[in-house]
């Protein structure tokens, strides 16, 4: 039990540098431009990193272009994008840190139990940022805001995944 208390404190510490209101606004406005493109986002991730697609039993070994139009693919893409949408909606307010922690903790634990590696998390991040930056107005300020946001999330997730 003591271990989990220490882990929780470490995770809270990792997200204790919340986005400023300006950063949160940049992340929220850019996300609003792409969050309805769930299928395209997941397609981009799988296309760039087939090893990630291979981690999903329902998609492993299947032609990406043929599964892109399936209901199963759309459903899973929506789950992933909804997770980010919820985190982003909560960002920018320190009063939401415990809610953010809860979401990140559950996601990190779920993915640790599935054997997802830090490398695969980083691949996902790279593909996600590539998709967003290619589909919104992307300047240094937006890039910095997304880097801060994702650094917070990934620092916390990696503490869980490597524990």
Curated annotation (Swiss-Prot):
Keywords: Heme, Iron, Metal-binding, Oxygen transport, Signal, Transport. This is Globin CTT-Z. CDD domains: Mb-like (cd01040). Residues 1-16 form the signal peptide. Transmembrane segments: none annotated. GO terms for molecular function: heme binding; metal ion binding; oxygen binding; oxygen carrier activity. SUPFAM superfamilies: Globin-like. One of its GO terms (cellular component) is hemoglobin complex. InterPro entries: Erythrocruorin (IPR002336), Globin (IPR000971), Globin-like_sf (IPR009050), Globin/Proto (IPR012292), Mb-like_M (IPR044399).
């Amino acid at each position: 039990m003591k271990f989990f208390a220490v882990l929780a404190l470490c995770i809270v510490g990792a997200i204790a540098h919340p986005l400023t209101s300006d950063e949160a606004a940049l992340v929220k406005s850019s996300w609003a431009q792409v969050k309805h493109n769930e299928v395209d986002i997941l397609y981009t991730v799988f296309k760039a990193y087939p090893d990630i697609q291979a981690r999903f039993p329902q998609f492993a070994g299947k032609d990406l272009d043929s599964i892109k139009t399936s209901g199963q693919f759309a459903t899973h893409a929506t789950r992933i994008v909804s997770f980010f949408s919820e985190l982003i909606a909560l960002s920018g307010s320190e009063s939401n840190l415990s809610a953010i922690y809860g979401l990140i903790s559950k996601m990190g634990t779920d993915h640790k139990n599935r054997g997802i590696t830090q490398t695969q998390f980083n691949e996902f991040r790279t593909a996600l940022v590539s998709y967003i930056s290619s589909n919104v107005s992307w300047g240094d300020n937006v890039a910095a805001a997304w880097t801060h946001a994702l650094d917070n999330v990934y620092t916390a997730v990696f503490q869980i995944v490597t524990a």
